[in-house]
Amino acid sequence: MKDFAKYAFNKSHAACYAVVAYQTAYLKVHFPVQYMAWLISSVTDKTSKVAEYILAAREMGISILPVDVNKSVAEFGVEGKNIRFGFNAVKSMGRPTITAIIEERTNNGDFHSMQDFITRMAGVINKRTVEHLILAGAFDTFGNTRRGMMNVYERMIDSAVKQNKDAISGQMSLFDFVSEEDKQSLEMKVPDIQEFEKEDLLEREKEVLGVYVTGHPLDEYTGMW
């Protein structure tokens, strides 16, 4: 620290920087996943920095997991030895919407399908939010293709909004007379269609996240040079 304090600044200023440098180095060595998650979260408004730090994390052997409606939190989070993308990184996701999603999940359990998510969050989300979550991979956990979900999400939202309006006006619907288990069987189905071509899928992903997460367009050329 004494040697560091001799460099350019007055001693008190340089000593403070030295302390921060040593603390940061300690955290990076002993708590690498937590440190990188915090570091990436600190620059979510700077896409180029997010990409830079994600690359650095991967070079450290840390996997970056995509957004997940049942696992993501607002910031980049620690999940075992991996880092999970946070909702803050998704284009058009505001803090009130993120808070509402996490609270709904905490109070009433995980979402079991995209339609379940849309139905439970109909008063908070809009079509753009759902579109961006689809393209970010947030619903991949349900086993549907992103292309299939893009094909049907608008109709799901329109249906959920109508149900909400009917509930407010006191009108009854078929869903009022069936059990929770039966409601799941009556859900609008996501069509089982082929996924987007890899390059198209990744470009759409990058459009809403600012970075590639589940792959890279040049992956197939790895090892050719």
Tell what function each PLM region has.
Residues 1-225:
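Noncatalytic, beta-rich nucleic-acid-contacting surfaces in large DNA/RNA-processing enzymes
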